[in-house]
Every structure is written in C-alpha cells, then in structure tokens.
Amino acid sequence: FNSNTYASVHGLEVYTADNINYDLAKNLVKNITETAGIGYSSNKISKVMNGIYTRTFTESEIESSSKENEEKGRVPYDITTKSNYYYIIRETGGIVTGAYVDNRNEEIKANPYVKSNVGSETYLLELGYISNNTDLDNLLNNMDKYAEGIIKSITPLYK
C-alpha cells in the first residue's frame, strides 16, 4: 500500500523495470482492476501507462547518495538516471536492471545476478493508497479479489 499527504490520490500502481516488455504488467493492472474494483492510480509521476510506473533516480538523488556514501567511506552504487530506484526491482533483475551491491553489508560480497541474464522479472504492486479511505476500505473488504487478480495474471505463465 502507498500513502500520500493528499487523501484524493488513489488507485493501483504497478512498478516495473525500465524498457521491458510490459505484457505481464498490463495483465496485472487489467486483472486486479477488474476483479478488485480498484481504478488506476491518479499519480502522474513516473507513469508509463495507466497503472504502470517506472521510477528511476533523479540527478539530485544521485548527488545526495554519492555525497552520503563518500562521507561514510562507502563505495557508492553505480547509479544513473536510468537506474531503477526501487531496490527490489534493481537488485533482482540481472543485467537488464543493473543489479549490483554497494558494500553496505560486508557479508554479501557480490550479487549473484549482477552478470546474469536470468535475473527474475520483478514487479512492485502498490494496491492502493492507505491515505485514501476508499482504497483502504476496498482492500480490507476485497483481499481475496486482489489475490484473484494477481493469480489470474501469473498462472497462465506456468501452463
């Protein structure tokens, strides 16, 4: 679930890696909105198409991250304005998302997917806004419908 200072912001947001085949993302959006009765998000920031978003780093975020890492003596992420902002998408996607580690966890010496073309295809599903009463009520009263929409999108991939 997402939140916003404005209670009027609402709807489903599916975050993806940049420049992918959007077929699964489109199916997720279609099936979740149809089965759960939630609409597309009204959020316009990072929007690729209705309900689908790709969030990448901004120049100021890169500068801030570099400065913080330098101050703490860490090797910074090798990020650009094309790098996926969300860790779960960036770190599991292999070459396509530029998966890497930045030495914050000394026990992790290397990301096994950094040079792999078989990293998993990762999506971040934000099923509505907790700050919007309609979205929150819909989720609390229709959890099974949200799950049904997700299952309906994924099961054809394994048949």
Residue spans of the language-model regions?
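Active-site-proximal helix/loop segments of hydrolytic enzymes
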Residues: 1-159
